[in-house]
Amino acid sequence: MKAQEAVKLAWQHHTIVPAFNIPYLPMAKPVAQAIIDEKTVAMLQVARLEWEKFESRSLEAVAEEYFKYYDPKYTLLHLDHVPVIDEDHKRVDFMPILERAVKAGYQSVMVDGSRLSLEENIATTKQVAEFAHANGIACEAELGSVMGHEGSGANMDYEEIFRTKKGFTDLNEAKRFTAETGCDWLSVAVGSIHGAIADGVRNQKKPEARLDIQHIADLSKITGIPLVLHGGSGINNQCILDG
């Protein structure tokens, strides 16, 4: 099953396709085996920061491990966060990374332009969506600011952020963004927190996050495409079920 078909089917049935990151290469085998044992459709994924700052080695290394253990009925391979501006606020030459992913056999890719202006994010995402579709794979994009990668996840006043909806995906921007970019899935900011990766806070405990369920419903209605939740670990379980 193609990733695009799997996610669309899950969306239509009001369920999810879970995705598991591989920051350390030996995780690929047990994650793939667990997915197959459970007979559920799920993704293995790796983000750029996981070969830059952790031990997944490269997107090609993860793909090589994936294809040793995968089952096409259940497992999918996704390239997670490829930022245009990374967590250290440096510009990334992102297109060659996406091209490598296509060659390695990834079924979907994510471009993260969330640190760009809205206009730049739209233009960049449109470019990547066209590239992905020309190669027969799906494109995920991000709009809004999911906290945590820069270290804010451990020290933030979470209650204040949730109350004010700071960084949450704007409804009107989301409607325009999806219409103009052609992305297949949209990663949204609705209360979750990325794990912090900055030195000094990496090992601190995340706050227990929750989700703004009404905001999710509004975003789903206004965009008309599947939404993606990042920072899923540490969220109140009932919020996950409700979302």
Tell what function each PLM region has.
Residues 3-13, 25-50, 56-74, 84-85, ...:
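Alpha/beta enzyme core
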Residues 231-235:
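Short acidic/histidine-rich active-site segments
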Residues 80, 230:
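Active-site glycine-centered loops adjacent to acidic/histidine catalytic or metal-binding residues
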